[in-house]
């Protein structure tokens, strides 16, 4: 029914004709005539609209709802909020100085010398291109003798250390240490070569030495720093590798330990599994793993324990350009070159490798032997030393001089030089000094704080003598009295005690500072710098001198001179 007819029906009270409870009754004649006339008018309107191809009266359309065909995205799940340590750690006004003694190490710069042949003990490998990872042990502040015991309540609070300043002292003069290989895989000088060697079957290795990339690095945190390197991956079973095929690569993350090799300019990779010739790189890394700090992962650490802050400086350039001898595993496509008519007719080795160099060594851009103050860490941990420990990862290749030592095989020393009568040795020495400023902080043990710390690291509460009881058991357990007796069945071996130290199997340089804390900041170089930086005044050690009391024989005040007028 058209809209016009509906209006007329409502106007002339004809709506009851369509009601279900309507009882028929006679209608007036004029009402029936009016109703028929308007129905005819609506029919003419419909015929008029049907003559148009693309036009249809809107009152004959029906609205139909259809669901959208687009993808419906659900809201992302909520992310657990990580709280900054400043929100629940309250600093105090008490600062301590702690410093290590002079830390020295000596060894062979290229490899470890095993015991034997006159050596009663192994000579370690000590190179300037190794990570030095110091694990600094701090005293427990909750068991520490404090000058003021009213700064915290042991029933509702706990004490922690926060690192406020650090200075890493570095000894020994600047120098350039060389590394090399007596059988280095060096084929051609591809920078200035006139004729390349195409077919090589004999041994063309040579004795080559290089100076590595310069690196200065310092990472401070309460957890070990994380490194990355490329290692040999696992091939799929559907695509097995044949002998001589290039193995797949896999990026691995490991903890940076003391003695690990840094990136020297040849890449961060496992050379022991990815280079079977043992002559592609110098001696000190040909069977080692060179690691590079994974700054991306440490920066993304939700709690920020592995890196409070970091300092780094790297410098490198290529000195020589060589290629490698051997069969090319990846053949050069013929579309990339035109065959020659003379020698060489086919392309030679296309595996190119530079010799790295760190260039000039200078003291103008040194990162060490200067203080650093920690005001705001890059992560959520603002210098709080959980578990009363601190990890300092250091690399400094600027004082990398290798000492050459020669000893005569005859006594006395022969008067005429003969190289066969002298033994040559190489040693590398390193010298460090660690100085810290620690601030004493308190943590109020509310339910929310303890719940958050337990979710972050439950072992922290265990160190504070808080434990979670195991769930009660309802089963009956048999307990024998004489466990070692042969009269009873063999009992199960007791479970080994859990190792509370998660870094027990890792290698670090342990530095114990539990007995080297001092409140006398002005007695140490770093402490005096901190007092100046913080605007604090040092405590007077010598009191002011007292004025001497006046003696009993003190003369009286001189009388004033009286002027006498002369008489006229």
Swiss-Prot record:
Chain residue ranges for the region called Disordered: 537-568
SUPFAM superfamilies: Group I dsDNA viruses
GO molecular function: structural molecule activity
Any one Gene Ontology BP term: virion attachment to host cell
Subcellular location: Virion; Host nucleus
Annotated transmembrane regions: none
Cellular-component GO terms for this entry: host cell nucleus; T=7 icosahedral viral capsid
Keywords: Capsid protein, Disulfide bond, Host nucleus, Host-virus interaction, Late protein, T=7 icosahedral capsid protein, Viral attachment to host cell, Viral penetration into host cytoplasm, Virion, Virus endocytosis by host, Virus entry into host cell
Ranges of compositional bias, category Basic residues: 537-548, 558-568
Pfam families: Late_protein_L1
Complexes and interactors: Self-assembles into homopentamers. The capsid has an icosahedral symmetry and consists of 72 capsomers, with each capsomer being a pentamer of L1. Interacts with the minor capsid protein L2; this interaction is necessary for viral genome encapsidation. Interacts with protein E2; this interaction enhances E2-dependent replication and transcription activation.
Family: Belongs to the papillomaviridae L1 protein family.
Functional summary from the UniProt entry: Forms an icosahedral capsid with a T=7 symmetry and a 50 nm diameter. The capsid is composed of 72 pentamers linked to each other by disulfide bonds and associated with L2 proteins. Binds to heparan sulfate proteoglycans on cell surface of basal layer keratinocytes to provide initial virion attachment. This binding mediates a conformational change in the virus capsid that facilitates efficient infection. The virion enters the host cell via endocytosis. During virus trafficking, L1 protein dissociates from the viral DNA and the genomic DNA is released to the host nucleus.
Record protein name field: Major capsid protein L1
Organism whose genome encodes this protein: Human papillomavirus type 18
